[in-house]
C-alpha cells in the first residue's frame, strides 16, 4: 500500500491497494541502435538489388546477339533503380527524418561535465562545513612527528 496515496489522481481500487502507472520509454541508445540496423539493412538490400540488376544487364548484353529483344527497357529500370538507391543512401546517411529526431536525441543526452562539476561543488561544500578529514599519517607528518 502506498503511503502517498493522496498524490494519485485516481482513487485506489477496492481493497485499498494503489497501482503505479509507469510510462514505458525506450532508451535513446536502443532507438539509435534499431535505426542504425534498419539503415544498414536498407543499404545492403539496395546494394544486393544493384548487383542483381547489373547481372541481368550483363546477361542480356551477352545474349543480345542470340535474341532479338529490346535491352533499353532493362536499362531504363536500371537507371531508375540506381537513382532510387542513391537517393535512399543520401537520405540514410543524412541521418534525419526532418531533423527533429536526431537533434532531440542529442539534446536528451546527459551532460557529464555538469554532473561532475556539481559533484565537485558538493564535495567542496562538505569540506567547508564539516572540515577536511585527513588520514592519521598525513596529520602526523604535518605536525612533524
From Swiss-Prot:
<keyword id="KW-1035">Host cytoplasm</keyword>
<dbReference type="Pfam" id="PF03052">
    <property type="entry name" value="Adeno_52K"/>
</dbReference>
<dbReference type="InterPro" id="IPR004292">
    <property type="entry name" value="L1-like"/>
</dbReference>
<dbReference type="GO" id="GO:0044220">
    <property type="term" value="C:host cell perinuclear region of cytoplasm"/>
</dbReference>
<protein>
    <recommendedName>
        <fullName>I-leader protein</fullName>
    </recommendedName>
</protein>
Amino acid at each position: 500500500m502506498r503511503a502517498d496515496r493522496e498524490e494519485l489522481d485516481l482513487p485506489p481500487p477496492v481493497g485499498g491497494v494503489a497501482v503505479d502507472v509507469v510510462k514505458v520509454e525506450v532508451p535513446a541508445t536502443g532507438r539509435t541502435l534499431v535505426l542504425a540496423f534498419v539503415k544498414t539493412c536498407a543499404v545492403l538490400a539496395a546494394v544486393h538489388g544493384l548487383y542483381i540488376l547489373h547481372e541481368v544487364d550483363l546477361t542480356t548484353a551477352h545474349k543480345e546477339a542470340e535474341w532479338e529483344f529490346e535491352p533499353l527497357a532493362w536499362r531504363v529500370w536500371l537507371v531508375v533503380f540506381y537513382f532510387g538507391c542513391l537517393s535512399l543512401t543520401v537520405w540514410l546517411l543524412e541521418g534525419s527524418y526532418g531533423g527533429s529526431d536526431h537533434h532531440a536525441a542529442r539534446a536528451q543526452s546527459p551532460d557529464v561535465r555538469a554532473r561532475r562539476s556539481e559533484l565537485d561543488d558538493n564535495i567542496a561544500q562538505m569540506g567547508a562545513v564539516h572540515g577536511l578529514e585527513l588520514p592519521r599519517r598525513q596529520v602526523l607528518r604535518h605536525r612533524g612527528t
